[in-house]
Amino acid sequence: MRLSRYFMPILKENPKEAEIVSHRLMLRAGMIRQQSQGIYSWLPLGKRVLDKVNAIIREEQNRAGAIELSMPTLQSAELWQESGRYDAYGKEMLRIKDRQDRPMLYGPTNEEMVTDIFRSSVKSYKDLPLNLYHIQLKFRDEIRPRFGTMRSREFMMKDAYSFDLTREGAEHSYNKMFAAYLRTFERLGLRAIPMRADTGPIGGNLSHEFIILADTGESEVFCHKDFVGFDIPGENTDFDSVEGLKAIFDKWTSLYAATSEMHDEAAFNAVPEGDRLSARGIEVGHIFYFGTKYSEPMGAKVQGPDGKEHFVHMGSYGIGPTRLVPAIIEASHDDNGIIWPASVAPFDVVVINMKVGDQACDDTCELIYAALKKAGKDVLYDDTDDRAGTKFATADLIGVPVQIIAGPRAVANGEVEVKDRKTGARETMTIEAAINRFVA
């Protein structure tokens, strides 16, 4: 992508409305723009990051055996009345009526709808276990939306829903998502700690929040410091192994970890003082097991091996991609801007032409740009006529992991400079070596 033809409206000054680092940097880097309170447009740079986050989420959901579908954003109020949540959910749910005066709602979550899909299609235990997920925009009318897309009214959510014949089967499905979430966050460059959580309006009796530690987090968290060094389940994790996944779950829940809502001061004080960690954190995922809370009132049942009908046991599992993006920034930035993990960076490399119009610089940059694109890399080519300082500031602000800098003096010697955004380390190398480093 040539920067001269790209839409990336950079802000030079810090926006007054931004209270936290991620909101400020997302606005300055031209990733998002606010349309109304708590509602944002994702501009091209932000959309590229969001798409890469979603791709990793999809890969790990699929790896764990979940199956993707797509459900509508507008839902019938009748389904929510059937489950008993229509009146109980509160003012966060946006209620509307269509032209036939039928009550509808803009879905804040999808337990009722996915249960309706299940009950109309699945009749036998032989079709279980089943886990369905989708990635969709949702709306909750927050009283006080703040911090940009960290806590917005319209947001994107990956929500998965599992169906099992027994509680034991449902707990295995829960453990699958537990392990999948640990893998997902690690691939996004985050260390998330699972903490026992309140079930809230979703309901149920087993729930964990996944929290990353950050000074700007809304939650106060208390945990054993060893969580920071725990090994993440590997790519070869057997998601069909009941014992293997139970071992992962037991390991990650064996030490004390709780948000302020579930904090037990006495239990935390029992942790050796040198091992206690109290900090602030950001919730990036939430999983629930709620048994037959929805299947019973909505009649979601299957015929079991005994020939009798059984209400299915359910769980739900949420990750907010539009919340994850600012969370990654909160965890990875410096005074100059964002430092993206390579897995979600909008571009792999930015090629900076220090003197546009100089034939040697132009030819060198075109050569590198073409070679990296041919190798399948996402490349941003700064071919603008901005001053050198502006080019460097822009590259640092948007956080591309690698900068390849071509100036007249270096190019005359057949060389370019390569800068690592995270460490700031610079290395001069031949043009061929620079290309080979990133196409190998």
From Swiss-Prot:
Disulfide bonds: none annotated. GO terms for cellular component: cytosol. It catalyses: tRNA(Pro) + L-proline + ATP = L-prolyl-tRNA(Pro) + AMP + diphosphate. One of its GO terms (molecular function) is proline-tRNA ligase activity. Keywords: Aminoacyl-tRNA synthetase, ATP-binding, Cytoplasm, Ligase, Nucleotide-binding, Protein biosynthesis. It holds the Pfam family HGTP_anticodon. One of its GO terms (biological process) is prolyl-tRNA aminoacylation. Its EC number is 6.1.1.15. Its main location: cytoplasm. PROSITE patterns: AA_TRNA_LIGASE_II. Homodimer. Belongs to the class-II aminoacyl-tRNA synthetase family. ProS type 2 subfamily. Catalyzes the attachment of proline to tRNA(Pro) in a two-step reaction: proline is first activated by ATP to form Pro-AMP and then transferred to the acceptor end of tRNA(Pro). This is Proline--tRNA ligase. It comes from Rhizobium etli (strain ATCC 51251 / DSM 11541 / JCM 21823 / NBRC 15573 / CFN 42). The gene is proS.
